[in-house]
Amino acid sequence: MSRPLARKPPQSRRQQARVNRGRRRQELMTRSQRAVRWLQPGLVVKRWVLTSGLGLLMALVGGAVWADLKPIYWILETLSWLLGTLTTVLPREFTGPILLLVGVALVLWGQSRSFGSIQQALAPDKDTVLIDALQAQSRLNRGPNIVAIGGGTGLSTLLSGLKRYSSHITAIVTVADDGGSSGVLRRELGVLPPGDIRNCLAALSTEEPLLTRLFQYRFSAGGGLEGHSFGNLFLSALTAITGNLETAITASSRVLAVQGQVVPATNVDVRLWAELENGQRIEGESNIGHAPSPIVRLGCVPSRPPALPRALEAIANADLIVLGPGSLYTSLLPNLLVPELVSAIQRSRAPRLYICNLMTQPGETDGLDVRGHLRAIEAQLASLGLNQRLFSAVLAQDDLANSALIKFYQARGAEPVLCDAKGLRKDGYDVTQAPLQGARPTSTLRHDSRSLALAVMRFYRNHKRESSQ
């Protein structure tokens, strides 16, 4: 015989009812706070709601005039009778405030519920509240126009931090890579190397993390697939479908909800070459990174590749131009082999900032300090007939504390990039030093995206404040 179910004690039911009342009260307070936040300036919503309300009022007045004002007379008479009845029951000192509060509450409640329905329809699976998304987008839309030039992991690290400060970001990316998955696709399919572009798209993506991870996924097995990333294959396929990489990037940007734009430095097949101090000449980006002697000069075939109009337009409208961080000879200087890009940077009145690496790279920048990196940039420009200093502001790491991680890198031939700030300032450089590695312990010596972006934005704000004085 089954035992009867035990009834919940009265005390437990009262506690549950108290909890439910607390939850409802908390939900009501949250909704009220969200409703009030719609009144904050800068959302670019209220002006259009008010415009719609004004339009509705004008339409009603127009209809009433068309009907010989009879509807207006009837409405005024009805309101006069209703208000007179209310004031006979309750004094005006009570009636007015009560009607005002009820009206405001209804407006805010209706507004909150209507926008909540819109949010549920547009993005039912996202936890972001519409007012939060609008406030964040409004803040990002007020951000500066930033042009970041480079390639490799350094540029993608910078972009993932900068997207917290602005939605007007343009990444100009080198297309000289000939190693790894990009090199294979370049040789076999004849496409421009998609690897650095893929990294930048993923860094600027605001889509779900799973989609970004899919774009970055690298196959570890399978005949013909091993070593390739899904994003590289995706971009290569889109290039074949659309006919050019630029259109493929635009389509990929929509898929990943990219905040900003990614533009190749050029749309031609560029092959790098380097002259070494020992007189040797080596070809190919992957070989230059392991040069047996210091690099004297960098060049490419064809010698004067054209720039894309979107890149030139972005530089012309830039509020800030950033070069780096990244491999000096294989990620940064290849972009400066495009004469139109260099000319556009020279014409720009925006502050131009060079971000130096944390460590030297064996076979590429052995023994170079910050001044050595700047001299390499100036020497490269001089070889193109340009003697004007292109980047007069420098962002470098504070002195790195000696650690086991630094010793690990030193055992493999890398050294911290030293910065003689006083000497550089005497030479006319604007030097900023900051803790760019971040405070969290890491297994690699790389820039921290948040720390790096914060330092860049502080430089921009300081420059803007000084310029306005």
Report the location of each language-model feature.
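An anion/phosphate-binding loop that grips the pyrophosphate of nucleotide cofactors and donors
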Residues: 318
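Short glycine/serine/threonine-rich phosphate/pyrophosphate-binding segments
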Residues: 153-159, 181, 329-337
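N-terminal signal-anchor transmembrane helix
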Residues: 117-147
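C-terminal functional extensions of proteins
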Residues: 4, 22-44, 367-469
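A short helix->loop->beta-strand "cap" motif at the edges of active sites that frequently abuts
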Residues: 167, 348-352, 429
